[in-house]
Amino acid sequence: MGDLELLLPGEAEVLVRGLRSFPLREMGSEGWNQQHENLEKLNMQAILDATVSQGEPIQELLVTHGKVPTLVEELIAVEMWKQKVFPVFCRVEDFKPQNTFPIYMVVHHEASIINLLETVFFHKEVCESAEDTVLDLVDYCHRKLTLLVAQSGCGGPPEGEGSQDSNPMQELQKQAELMEFEIALKALSVLRYITDCVDSLSLSTLSRMLSTHNLPCLLVELLEHSPWSRREGGKLQQFEGSRWHTVAPSEQQKLSKLDGQVWIALYNLLLSPEAQARYCLTSFAKGRLLKLRAFLTDTLLDQLPNLAHLQSFLAHLTLTETQPPKKDLVLEQIPEIWERLERENRGKWQAIAKHQLQHVFSPSEQDLRLQARRWAETYRLDVLEAVAPERPRCAYCSAEASKRCSRCQNEWYCCRECQVKHWEKHGKTCVLAAQGDRAK
C-alpha cells in the first residue's frame, strides 16, 4: 500500500477497540461524530486492503475484538433515528439551519456502516462473529429489500437532481431518499454473504430467512423487477458505483454484479441441505420459484455454470407435490435490537429531536469550520481516488470526467458548462469544504 496507507500500524486496532453503541439521543454529538469519522477511516482502509489483496486486517480486528455486533446495533439504531427522529426535524417549519452537513453526517452514517459490513462480510468468520445479531441483520436486510421491491413498483428510485425552489432541509430529504436506494443494494450483498454461511447458521436464523420472511420468493421478485436496471431513451442503464451508467450493446448480456448476488443467494437458500430441510414448498412458493426458469438462459448458465444445478432443481420441482404450511411448535430466538431500542425510546421522539435541535444541529460558525477541517482530514483525496472502482464521473451529466472543482477539489466535471449548471446545487457544500481546507 505504501503511501496509500490511511491508518498507521496499531492505529486501526485502537479505532476498532474504541467502537461502541450510542443512545439515539447522542447521535450527532461530539463523541458520536468522532466515531463516525473513525468508521469512515476503517471503511476506506478495509476497501484499500481488499483492493491490494494484502490480507484483511480490519476484518480480523473486528472479529478479534468482538465488534461486529456493535456495528449491527449502530446500523439499526441509525435506521431507527432516520425513521423516527429525522422526520420530526423536517416538520419543524422554523428550523432553517444555515448548513445541514451535521445532520447529513447522521443520515449518511447508515450508508457508512452497511458499506463496511459489505466489505468485511465476504469472509465467513465475520458472519459467525456477529453471533445472535445476525438475526437482527437478516431482519434489517429484509426491510431494505422489501422497500426496494415496493419502490421499483412505483417508478424506481428518486432522481438526484433537486428543485431550484427547495430549501436545505428539503434537499437533504431528497438526498436521504436516494441514499436509501444505495443502502438497499448494499444490504442485498450483505444478505448474499450471510447465505454463504447457510451451513453454519443457527436454526433460528434459517427459520427467520425461510419461514418468517420467505426470502427465496422475495429474491425472485427482485429478479423480476431488477430495480438496478432501467431504460432511458431506449438505452439500457444499470446502477453501479453510486451512479447510473449506460450499458454498451455488446455488454448487455453480461451478468451484472447485483443480479449475480441474487442468483448466488437463491442457489444457497434452495440447494443447500440445511436450507432444504427447513424450507416449506407451499403452492405459493412453488409458483413463485418456477418463474425462475424463464431467466435461466444459456447465456446466464455460461456465466454461472453452477446454476445448472438450480435448473435441475426447478425441473424436479414441477413434479413435486406442494406442502401445507408447517405449524410446528418450535422455540426460537428472535431479533431483539429494534424492539429494545423502540421500547427504550417510545414516546421520546419529539424530546430527542428537540434536544438535538438545540444542542447538536445548531452549531456556531466556528464549530462548523472545525468540523469541516476534520472532514477534510478524514476524506483524503488520494485515498478516495484509490478506492474508487473506476475513473471519476461528471457530477452533472455522469460522463467520464477529467476536471475537478478548483475551490473544494471534491467534485469532478467533464467540461466547464456542466460545472456552471451544477453550481447552484454544489455551491452550498463547496464553500464549507473549501473553508475546511483553509483551516488546516
Curated annotation (Swiss-Prot):
Transmembrane segments: none
Region (Interaction with DNAAF11): 366-440
Subcellular location: Cytoplasm; Cytoplasm, Cytoskeleton, Microtubule organizing center, Centrosome, Centriolar satellite; Apical cell membrane; Dynein axonemal particle
A Pfam entry, by short name: zf-MYND
GO cellular component terms, semicolon-separated: apical plasma membrane; centriolar satellite; cytoplasm; dynein axonemal particle
Listed GO MF terms: molecular adaptor activity; protein folding chaperone; zinc ion binding
Ranges annotated as MYND-type zinc finger: 394-430
Keyword Metal-binding appears in the UniProt entry: yes
Entry keyword annotation includes Amino-acid biosynthesis: no
Binding site residues for Zn(2+) 1: 394, 397, 414, 418
Swiss-Prot/TrEMBL keywords: Cell membrane, Ciliopathy, Cytoplasm, Cytoskeleton, Disease variant, Kartagener syndrome, Membrane, Metal-binding, Primary ciliary dyskinesia, Zinc, Zinc-finger
GO biological process: cilium movement; inner dynein arm assembly; motile cilium assembly; outer dynein arm assembly; positive regulation of motile cilium assembly; protein localization to cilium
Binding positions for Zn(2+) 2 per the UniProt entry: 405, 408, 426, 430
Summary of the function given for this chain in its UniProt record: Plays a role in axonemal structure organization and motility. Involved in axonemal pre-assembly of inner and outer dynein arms (IDA and ODA, respectively) for proper axoneme building for cilia motility. May act by indirectly regulating transcription of dynein proteins.
Family classification: Belongs to the ZMYND10 family.
Related illness: Ciliary dyskinesia, primary, 22: A disorder characterized by abnormalities of motile cilia. Respiratory infections leading to chronic inflammation and bronchiectasis are recurrent, due to defects in the respiratory cilia. Patients may exhibit randomization of left-right body asymmetry and situs inversus, due to dysfunction of monocilia at the embryonic node. Primary ciliary dyskinesia associated with situs inversus is referred to as Kartagener syndrome.
Self-association and partners: Interacts (via C-terminus) with DNAAF11 (via CS domain); this interaction stabilizes DNAAF11 at the protein level. Interacts (via C-terminus) with DNAL1; this interaction stabilizes DNAL1 at the protein level. Interacts with DNAAF4, HSPA8, IQUB, RUVBL2 and DYNTL5.
Protein's recorded name: Zinc finger MYND domain-containing protein 10
Annotated organism of origin: Homo sapiens
UniProt lineage: Eukaryota, Metazoa, Chordata, Craniata, Vertebrata
